[in-house]
Regions:
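Cytosolic-side transmembrane-helix boundaries in multi-pass membrane proteins
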Residues: 1-33, 38-46, 267, 274-281, ...
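Helix-loop-helix "hairpin" substructures at the membrane interface of multi-pass membrane proteins
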Residues: 166, 232-308, 332-333, 337
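Transmembrane helix-bundle core of multi-pass membrane transporters
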Residues: 76, 81, 186, 190-255, ...
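Single transmembrane alpha-helix segments in multi-pass membrane proteins
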Residues: 40-46, 71-145, 157, 161-183, ...
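Interfacial/capping segments of alpha-helical transmembrane domains
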Residues: 38-82, 206-215
């Protein structure tokens, strides 16, 4: 029998390849997150707490109540996010998945913008501000101008991109010209945008007449994103725009010369500078493009879903986009999947609340998923995946 060659010794086994893959890590991250969330569901459930007071007398009541609480909570999450099999019609049943995709659309677009900065080594925290100014610009063009249908929609979307790009470009200029920390500048720009929006909604140019709450007029029908599946579903053309934006991110960062420069600056700014790449110019362009994409997300949100501007138009999209971009490893496919996941937890959380589960628990589930996915070594150790990556002991090593 021939002795094992070095090539055979270095060839990883199937188990080792599984252990090194990211897919099992993501799966186990969800498993651990939902297991810990199940414990929190039990603690928050009144029936479980009551049955626990006589656990040793009638343990079956406790286990039955625990099972019912967990199953009903996650069943409600599934029905609220994916498919409501208890609905009377198929339209109502599938509307939950369509609603999840609708909620995910602006979130994914904003996360794609965040990913541009992350891939280039810039930590953009200004998603909220860029989203707000993009929404405001698109809304103003939508209700303030009278244009032909297609031109009106394109103009409103372009205004959102331009405004978001301008807002991100301010931070990029400060970074390029004065080496100002982008984390600090984008956070400050967030607060400026929030207060700017609050002021705009008090002006005659933005505030709708005869309304009690600060709100703009509704955008005109010619500027609204058309719905893709009829009036019974809210999914609109923004979903297609989101897919095109993901394709643009892939092309920009993987196939274009500009994207290569961005990645080079992100990997090693000094080496990029020596190679003749202007780090300052790259930083400015990165923030310009990132802000434009986030502004597009704001425009899609106001033109496709909200149809009017209010002081809560950004919601938590700006900060959730940071998490989605990190969760998706700043890649187009990963961001789309992570965005749908976050949107599903949001839409399904409303159903969970009807089962007596606190709505804040949904945020806890999101945080747990992010926590575990952001720490692959922890997940591998907890799940035993790290044992699969240990090198094999060959026959020669055993004899030695």
């Amino acid at each position: 029998v021939s002795a094992p060659t070095a090539e055979n010794e270095n060839t990883p086994t199937l188990a080792a390849r599984i252990g090194r893959s990211e897919i099992p890590v993501v799966i186990m991250a969800f498993v651990f997150a939902f297991l810990i969330s199940a414990v929190l569901i039990l603690i928050s459930n009144e029936d479980v707490r009551q049955s626990a007071t006589y656990l040793f007398a009638r343990p079956s009541d406790f286990f039955r109540a625990s099972w019912d609480a967990i199953v009903s909570a996650y069943d409600a999450l599934f029905r609220g996010a994916v498919y409501d099999y208890r609905a009377r019609t198929s339209t109502q049943a599938w509307n939950r998945l369509i609603e999840t995709l609708t909620v995910a659309t602006p979130l994914i677009i904003a996360a794609l913008g965040m990913a541009v900065g992350f891939r280039a080594g810039l930590f953009n925290i200004g998603g909220t501000g860029q989203l707000i100014v993009g929404s405001a610009a698109a809304a103003w063009v939508g209700f303030g101008l009278s244009l032909p249908p297609v031109i009106h929609l394109i103009a409103a979307l372009a205004a959102g991109i331009a405004a978001g790009g301008l807002w991100g470009g301010i931070a990029g200029f400060l970074k390029a010209r004065f080496d100002a920390n982008e984390v600090i500048t984008t956070i400050m720009l967030n607060w400026i945008a929030v207060n700017l929006l609050a002021w705009l909604l008090t002006t005659a140019a933005f505030r709708a007449p005869n309304v009690l709450t600060p709100q703009s007029p509704q955008v005109k029908a010619t500027a609204m994103l058309p719905r893709l599946l009829g009036d019974q579903f809210r999914l609109h053309l923004g979903f297609v725009i989101m897919l095109l934006a993901a394709l643009f991110l892939w092309w920009l960062m993987s196939r274009s010369t500009l994207g290569f420069r961005f990645r080079a600056v992100g990997e090693n700014p000094r080496a990029a500078q020596v190679a003749g790449i202007s780090v300052g110019t790259s930083s400015f362009l990165v923030m310009l493009i990132a802000g434009g994409l986030v502004g597009l997300g704001g425009a899609v949100n106001v033109l496709g879903t909200e149809h009017s501007l209010n002081d809560g138009i950004a919601g938590s999209i700006g900060f959730d986009a940071i998490t989605v971009a990190l969760l998706g490893r700043s890649g187009p496919v990963g961001i789309i999947l992570a965005g749908i996941l976050f949107a599903g937890l949001s839409t399904g959380g409303r159903y969970m609340e009807g089962q007596g589960v606190p709505i804040d628990l949904v945020a806890v589930i999101q945080a747990l998923v992010v926590l575990f996915i952001a720490a692959p070594p922890l997940v591998r150790r907890m799940s035993g995946l790290n044992l699969l990556t240990r090198p094999r002991r060959t026959a020669a090593a055993k004899e030695a």
